[in-house]
Amino acid sequence: ASPIDFVPLSQSVFPGDTVAIAVGPEVPGINEVVIALLKCFEDTQASMADITVVVPYDGETAGQLKEAIASEFSSVGFQVHDAHDDEALAYLAASAVGDPIMVNRTLCDADVVIPITTVRHDGMLGYNGGFDGLIPEFSDAATQQRFCELISATDETGGLQRRGDVRETAWLLGIQLSVRVVPNSIGGVASILAGMGGQLDVAAEEELKQACSVSPEQAPLVIASVGGNAGAGHWRSLANAAHAASQFVQANGVVVLLSDLNESVGTATRFLADLDDESAGRRVMESQQPDQIIAMELLRLRGICRIYFCCGGRQDELEEIGVGFAADISEIENLCTEYDKCVVLHGADRVIPVQA
């Protein structure tokens, strides 16, 4: 299919153009999506050696993508963004409120920047608008911390500022063509859209609603599953799953988060061992850690209900922060017998609660 409100790729890339493909966090089917896009470049006048794929985090997903690209396109470059490496960052401009916009240097220097991102919705924690997944993911550590603080703001000012910064960054980078991957409720791909501007945003939002909308139904027990890969991006998925579950659970009920996360509790989350919520919240905000968002959401959630994790994490660490631990599905099944009603949310990090 042709891009939405945009010319074919062959008419927008020219000989000598350097191309940066910015891969956002937790894009389902990312290997296949990137390979498909690179194959489209074979029909253009661009040299494959002038294309670099940039990912926001290192880890298993990044390694698999690098191998997939190398097996098909040996001359295509691959880079893992480092928010702490000043040499790998470039000053783009100042934001509307005067904050410096520092962005990955490869993106800044490229003639053509094409982001590949997961479509998210307005109710998600940290949603940054149509170009969600561009920054703070590909910015410096200071910007990432500033965005975390804005996400935790209680009013709408933080969200407006974040989205404004992201839009401005996309404009300054000269981004025209974008690829949006619409997830389904079980972590797969519902559809893939490409194009430019508001028409792409509208189409992507409509596709996401069709794929992930759920009518809210209150229950004393909510079981929320989240997929994805362990890493900095996965903490945001956990936070979104917890946030979605909070809209379905009854007061003083129980939320069980099912995750494939197999690592120790993060630095920010450890501060939840402080039972004084105000003190814990302050320490979390000062931590500047990737798990800051999930820590703040768990702090909010524990004031509403009891929380259990069923994951590969350590039981002692979870219990220290006031979270119950379910070793396997059988323990969850036993928990279900204690309640007369249960809501199960598959892909809770992507669920869109809507009124029936």
Tell me the role of every PLM-derived stretch.
Residues D17-P28, T52-Y57, I223-S225:
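Short glycine-rich or small-residue beta-strand-to-loop segments that form or flank ligand, phosphate
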